[in-house]
Each structure stands twice: as C-alpha cells, then as structure tokens.
Amino acid sequence: MSVLPGPSKLDFIPWDFTSEDHVQRAYLQRFACGWRWWELDDWVKANKAGKMMVYWLVLTDEVPDREAQVATHIARYPKESLPLTDTAPQSWLNTPRTPTNRPLNPIGHVALTLQSPQDLIPVGLDPGSTKAASIGKLYVSYALQSHGYGGLAMRAVETIAETQLGCDMCILDTIVEEFQMRRDVMERWYTAGGNPLPKISNQAWYIKMGYEIFHKDEKGYLHTHADDGSQEYLPVAYFRKMLR
C-alpha cells in the first residue's frame, strides 16, 4: 500500500493478526528489537477490536538494490528467511480488504493506535479538543538502519492518522535520553546483542522529526530484560506533534 504521494521506497502492508506466521514474525522482530516482545497477545486483541493497526515495512522496486538489502537483513536474521504472504483480511476499524496473496519480506514494522479519552487524560491531554493516534512499535532491521526507512515510516503513519483516521495529533513515547545513552545501558541493550550503538538518542531523533515533549514519567515502563528476564521501571518521555 502506497501512502505518501509519489514513488516510495516502502510499502505498508497490514499485519494479519489471524495468521500464526505473521504473529511469529512479529515476535521475532520484537525480540530482535529488544523491546516489548511479550505484548503480542495485546496486539492481537487491539487489532481485532479495530483500535490498532500494525504495518509491515516492505521494500519496493524503488530501492535499486532491494534484493541485496533483503538478503542483508536475512543474513542477520536467518529465522526470517521464508517470506510471509499478504493475507490480512481487514484494515482500519475492521474495514474489509482484499489481500494480494503476494510474498513479502518485511524489514520492520510500525503501529498506529487510536487513543481513547482514558488514554489521554493521564498524560494531561484534553480528550474533548483532541483526536489523537499513538505511533509505536517502530522497528527497522538493525542490518538496514541509516537508509532513512524510519523517517519514511513516521511520515507515512502520520499521513494515515490525519487522512484516514481524522486525527489532529500524533503522540508517542520513548526512554528519556539520559537513561538510554548511559554506557551501561548501551552495553546491555545494543553491544551485548551484536547491534550498533545509536548515533543519537530516540528522544533527539523524535525531536528532529518535529515532536515536542509534553510529559515525563520516571516509572513509565516496567521493562523485562531479554538477557536475564529481570524487570526494571524505566523513565519515559511523552511526545506530541500537531498534524494540522
């Protein structure tokens, strides 16, 4: 599915929450990301209720070396070597769609979630004057970062939020910069898993994308560490961006 005007390097293919193959691939990518892989059951429930949509990020023919990039991704993550099939039977708000049944090799994913008043009030937003969608679950293969795919995905889901869902704001959250960029945190989250260190923090990157911080919570996430299963509360910054 093309979202932005003009040729695009990414297609955004709906995740089929009814497919064991799609659910398992999402688990593999979340585990590779190192972040909230244990939430897949919640993803299925939210998608089934029409409140959330997950999109696979799939390279298009606009990428000159598409096959080589897919091969690079698979070499890094061999469990993803078999292509999925576009089988999602619905899109937003349970709207029926006709799947293409074409093979696809997703190199990441991103999600949009419609926010209810109960979601907005705790972070200080007025549900009476704001219709918001939350952007989350953004993941681009560590083997293919620095190609601009993350920024492209953000612009696309912002467009979907505004044009298809009628939202005037996108919100998101991430770990605060001071925590993420600590040496011990980067060693545990990136180096130990064989992944490159981030060039900038998530916080700085979202600000670069036009978002502003409006709320912080020192115990925003209860995170389960992939290496030993221990849990820790993490400090979180909440961001917003007006779409119109």
Where on the chain are the PLM-derived regions?
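Conserved acetyl-CoA binding element of GNAT-fold acetyltransferases
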Residues: D126-Y142, D173
